[in-house]
From Swiss-Prot:
This is Glutamyl-Q tRNA(Asp) synthetase. Its EC number is 6.1.1.-. InterPro entries: Glu-Q_tRNA(Asp)_Synthase, Glu/Gln-tRNA-synth, Glu/Gln-tRNA-synth_Ib_cat-dom, GluQ/Sye, Rossmann-like_a/b/a_fold. Zn(2+) binds at C100, C102, Y122, C126. One of its GO terms (cellular component) is cytosol.
Amino acid sequence: MAIAPRGRFAPTPSGDLHLGSLVAAVGSYLHVRSQCGTWLLRIDDLDAPRVVPGASDRIQTCLEAFGLHWDEVVYFQQPQQEHYQAALEQLTATGRVYRCQCSRKQLSQSGDSVSVDGSLRYPGFCRDRQLSSEIEGSDRLNVQNLPAIALEDAWQGRYQQDLAQAVGDFILRRRDRLFSYHLATVVDDARQGITEVIRGLDLLASTPRQIALQQLLNLPTPHYGHLPLVVWPNGDKLSKQTKAPPLDLRQAPALLSQAIGHLGLAMPSDLQGAPVGEQLAWAIAHFPAPRLSKQPDSLS
């Protein structure tokens, strides 16, 4: 018997949602609802220094204003530390985890190449030093000799990456003892039974790292789909860093119409700006768009 799809929207509570966030949320919502699946809300509050007080509550209020009602209870990362620790111990038992003392300054001065996500590719300075776990530092995963990771993305097609060449050994737990986004995401997706990960194109390059962790931890790999980003006219991604304005809940119907349009759906003119429930019902019945662009969609 086929497993009912389970998707999720997992914002970081570092501020309010903006149009780019809304497009990602609506895309993941429509993807699972169009298959009669379950849609979950996860608050990625693991990185405590980035959490803005009250942002989690505002995110939930915002989603409800747009008719994006989630199933089950909201899942928070902060209470899941023991599960991340267990996963790290399981990875350590494979012999692929090592302590690293390299600072960002050292790496920036190393002259090594830039990785696929814009950060520096780790050159492996500490890989063979066999540093004690009692020494202050981060924990990295040795990706040398791992097979290339390939996936079939729902919208971007086939994507392949050799982790050793593309990113190098990556961090599982930071120097400040916070678990990494990649490790936490993999553990959370498995614990929540996520089968569909629909998110922005900026996260495609990080997906092979997550698949590698799933394979090493013997966890299932979800289906992935990476949506084209919403960008400013100059090509910069809409984000908190580029001053994307927070969503105005008073304009929810108009903004939802805009988000649905960014997903390639040509909604009838009489539904433009209609109550959010009516718009979502139509979009669920017509998702996905026959030809969703792979390119970023500029904000007009």
